[in-house]
Amino acid sequence: MTTDDVWGWSFDVCGIKLYHEKGYKGQGITIINHEANSGHSAMTTNMLKRVAPAATVINARVTQTTSAEKLYSYNWKIDGKTYTFDEMYNTFKPDIISTSFIGTVCKERDDMLKGHIENGDFIMCCATGNNGAEGVQGVYRNVAINVGACFFRGCKSKIDIMPYSGRNKDNLKVDYVGFVGDGSGTSNACPFVAAQIALFMCRYGKVPQNEFKQIIKPYCIDLGDVGKDYKFGDGLIVLPDKEIIRMKFKDVSQNDWGKSSIDWIAEKGIMNGYDDGTFRPDEHLTRRELSVILNRFYELIK
C-alpha cells in the first residue's frame, strides 16, 4: 500500500477530501507551526499544507527561559526576526498554533496562553508525546487541545496506536488525550488535527477553542471504548457536512464557565433562550420545566 493510498483513506473518512472538493482548503486561516526549532519542521509543515493547502503556514523557532512559576523570556523567531510573544501575536494574528513544545511547567506562561485561548484569540493544538515527557505538563494544565496519534495504514482494522506519552494508564487522566489524528506519531498527528480545524474555520468561521471542542465531539469516531477514554479521547475528528448552529446569548460571556454547555443544550433544542436574545443563566427552574428538559434530553439520546 502506498502513502497516497493511506492518505486517501484517512482523507475520505475524516471529511478532508469532501471539504477540498467543496473549496474549503484553509483560505483565510493562519497557522503558526511551532516546530522550526526541531527536525520536525519540514514534516509538520508538509502535514499542515497537505490537509489545509490554502492556509497560511508560518514556521516559528521558539526559545524560552522559565522556572516553575515565572516566565523570564518567550521569543518567537520568524523569517530571521525575533518577536516577543505579544509582538508575534499582534503581527501575525494566528488563528491556530500547532506545537509539541509544552514540556516544562511554567504557570505564568501557561496562564498567559490560557487567557488568549479563553478570549477566543486562537486555538492551540499540542502533541501528547509518543514515549517521552514532551507535552505532558501542558496537557495536565489543560492549556491546549491534546492530540494523540493513530496511524491507520489504510483501514481501521490496522491501527498503530501512539496516543500518549509512555506513562501507563493508571497515571493518566481520562482527558489526557483530547482527540486523535492520523499520523505515524503525535508530532505528525497534531498538525493533522490543527489543519482540520483550519478547514472547519474556513467553512463555518472562527470559533473559540472550547466551543470548537463542544461542536466537534458529536462528529468524532470512537476508536476504543465507547465515549471518552484515556487512549483516544473523544476519538477521530470527522469534519461535519451540515449547517452548524452556533448559539450566542448576549448575557452569556465568552469566559462564562457554563458557556459551552449552554450553547450545546440550546443547539440541541433542550433549552431555548428568550426573544430578547438572552439566556438568563441565573434564573431558577420549576419542576414542570425540569420535566420538559429531561424528556427532551431522553428523546435526544434514546
Language-model segment annotations:
Residues 107-125, 142-143, 260:
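Catalytic-core regions built around general acid/base machinery
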Residues 35-108, 223:
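Subtilisin-like peptidase catalytic core
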Residues 194-197, 245-247, 256-271, 275-302:
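Short, solvent-exposed alpha-helical surface patches in non-cytosolic proteins
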